[in-house]
Amino acid sequence: MIRPQLRTAGLGRCLLPGLLLLLVPVLWAGAEKLHTQPSCPAVCQPTRCPALPTCALGTTPVFDLCRCCRVCPAAEREVCGGAQGQPCAPGLQCLQPLRPGFPSTCGCPTLGGAVCGSDRRTYPSMCALRAENRAARRLGKVPAVPVQWGNCGDTGTRSAGPLRRNYNFIAAVVEKVAPSVVHVQLWGRLLHGSRLVPVYSGSGFIVSEDGLIITNAHVVRNQQWIEVVLQNGARYEAVVKDIDLKLDLAVIKIESNAELPVLMLGRSSDLRAGEFVVALGSPFSLQNTATAGIVSTKQRGGKELGMKDSDMDYVQIDATINYGNSGGPLVNLDGDVIGVNSLRVTDGISFAIPSDRVRQFLAEYHEHQMKGKAFSNKKYLGLQMLSLTVPLSEELKMHYPDFPDVSSGVYVCKVVEGTAAQSSGLRDHDVIVNINGKPITTTTDVVKALDSDSLSMAVLRGKDNLLLTVIPETIN
């Protein structure tokens, strides 16, 4: 009686491995089907797609794996990919199974950091927050809004990712240069007034530890109190030490017992067209505003711009020079000054005084100091101007439809506030064509006319012909 039972048990032991061997191919075939890529049509025909499905609350249809029809996405821990699987919901990733023979399922990406929600909870990842939000919407609860990367208790900033860390070279230059960039504020008294009011502002940068600052000549002028504000908020009174109206450069000086950050002059002759540059300054009285661009040409000759007596080549850039940015440094990616922001004509066309001329200007100033010579009094109008040429006139007509139909003269780029030019009625975009009965074709003609105590200017403004009288200021 016992022997048949033994035979049956033995038969079972023999049959079990065989059955398992038969089942494994079936399971493997099913898993293979799940991992096999879907068979996509050669041409997508949306008209043959099934009707747009109604998905679970909180999810919207997405394109299928063939990128043709819209289907409901797979939720967390649901099967994804393969011939039968679906694409995962936004924020989820189709994860490979831990063991062979099992399908891929949707889950949170392995990469990513903690995130703080508006419910003041710290979630392990953005994906985890979104998963809980989907569940909250299904239950009619309020979903959390991601408010910051990192834990909710963190007060510091998130560490830079690889792209920001490796390619954020502009920010590195600004951080290096900004402490040496200063805000130059001019104060003056209004007519019949005794109270000092701000009348003009510009920029500059420190070039020596004893407080020498380079800026534009049109930024500083006579009978004004000049205030310099450093990046750390320290304020100093400044005095003009030297000025060159032809170069549009000035040296001013502050007295400070603190150690001042200094910028080094690079060589503008080493610049290359297409090289990245950064223009820093304080437009609209804002500290350390930066604009970036490239060098359009490193030698835009003064004669090309219509300055017949000019032997200086300007650095043309496409970085924007805003109001108040004048006098700030133009730096390369090493943080060396390769120019002084000077002139903006139109969007994408700005000019800087090359650092090689700034170096020459400082050498001449040093020589004057060694010989005990003070610079002589000079006349000042308060204009940023450019000789008008045919190409420049055509460019200006494209930007300003009411620009006068003229191809020669001197174009007024900017009238400095509180100056003789502004008091006379001159405006931005005016064209000066005659002074004291003599035709004006270059900026040099305007500078030569400053020998007169009074200037009678013929000006074109749109379709109007104006006659203005300007009394130049004397810079002491």
UniProtKB/Swiss-Prot annotation:
Domain PDZ: 383-474
InterPro entries: Growth_fac_rcpt_cys_sf (IPR009030), IGFBP-like (IPR000867), Kazal_dom (IPR002350), Kazal_dom_sf (IPR036058), PDZ (IPR001478), PDZ_sf (IPR036034), Peptidase_S1_PA (IPR009003), Peptidase_S1C (IPR001940)
Annotated keywords: Disulfide bond, Hydrolase, Protease, Secreted, Serine protease, Signal
Signal peptide: 1-31
Annotated S-S bridges: C40-C66, C44-C68, C49-C69, C55-C72, C80-C94, C88-C106, C108-C127, C116-C152
UniProt entry tagged with the keyword Disulfide bond: yes
GO BP: any one term: proteolysis
Secreted as UniProt keyword: yes
Annotated ranges, domain Kazal-like: 88-154
EC number: 3.4.21.-
Enzyme class: hydrolase
Organism domain of life: Eukaryota
One GO molecular-function entry: endopeptidase activity
Domain IGFBP N-terminal: 36-109
Its biological purpose: Serine protease.
Protein name: Serine protease HTRA4
UniProt source species: Homo sapiens
Encoding gene (name): HTRA4
